[in-house]
Amino acid sequence: MTPPQEPALVTCVIASRNRRQDLLVSLPRHEAPVVLVDNASTDDTVAAVARAHPEVTVVPLPENVGAVARTIGVAHAGTPFVAFTDDDSWWAPGDLARAVEVMRAHPRLGLLAARILVGPEDRLDPVCTEMADSPLRREPDLPGPSLLGFVACAALVRVEAFTAVGGFDDVVRFPGEEERVALDLAAAGWGLAYVDEVTVHHHPSTHRDANTVRQTGIWRSRVLTALMRYPLPALAGQLLRAARAGRPGVRGLASAVPRVPAALRARRVLPTTVMTGVRELQG
């Protein structure tokens, strides 16, 4: 008699749009059940994945909701942990299971940020050096340097913590969606830590927005996050930084304007302890 399988502890949640070929390459590399939330692709992604990988749970959306698709994916996961892999990223063999064990050994850890190796050359993503050298005080009950930010494609979250802070929101959307989630996790008492011993591979898709478009989006997200969470003096400082950041910052400010009412409706100022960390990171 075959013993019953233990229930899965982790699910890979992927939000994707019009990256069918990237998915067909990356999906076989995942070592956990996969939930793919498709942001209204027009390249036959849903049908292609269903044919090639019937084991994948595909959630097709009628419109592009940005990073909110990940939150939808978490609701379909049914596991205590979720890894936010992208259509062009995957965990190194065995490392997702190791990361889950780290989470289980550190009950206050709400989010684990893995090391990121980029491309077939396995170049260390510069953000990993920044996370490893985080100026925030290292907490004794966390497995690595404390953080107030992360890269979604290399993050493992405790679902209890992620859902308690509302997941990714429909104000920021994408890109730069990580900051508000990180700040709210910290405000709720959850720890975020960089763990260099586990690795995610990221082979950036060729189907990407131009860097100038992405930088504009990131500044828009910074402004909206500040509107939702920063006290007024810090908010003013972030608006000034955006105005001084050249064309991407100015365009980011302008593109944030239509979402200002929604951001203000969601406004909840962070506690002083978290804002102290924000100021340390901003220098």
Task: Kindly give the residue locations of the regions a language model identified.
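Non-catalytic, C-terminal membrane-associated alpha-helical segments of glycosyltransferases
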Residues: 216-221, 231-283
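Glycine-rich, basic loop-to-helix element that forms the pyrophosphate-binding segment
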Residues: 60-77, 98
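Short, flexible, basic/aromatic active-site loop/helix in glycosyltransferases
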Residues: 114, 129-147
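Short aromatic/hydrophobic "clamp" motif used to bind/position activated sugar donors
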Residues: 82
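A conserved acidic beta->alpha catalytic loop
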Residues: 20, 29, 38-47, 63, ...
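Short, well-formed alpha-helical segments that are part of the catalytic scaffolds
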Residues: 13-32
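A short, conserved alpha-helix in the catalytic core of glycosyltransferases
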Residues: 149-157, 161-166, 171-198
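Conserved donor NDP-sugar-binding/catalytic core segment of glycosyltransferases
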Residues: 93-126
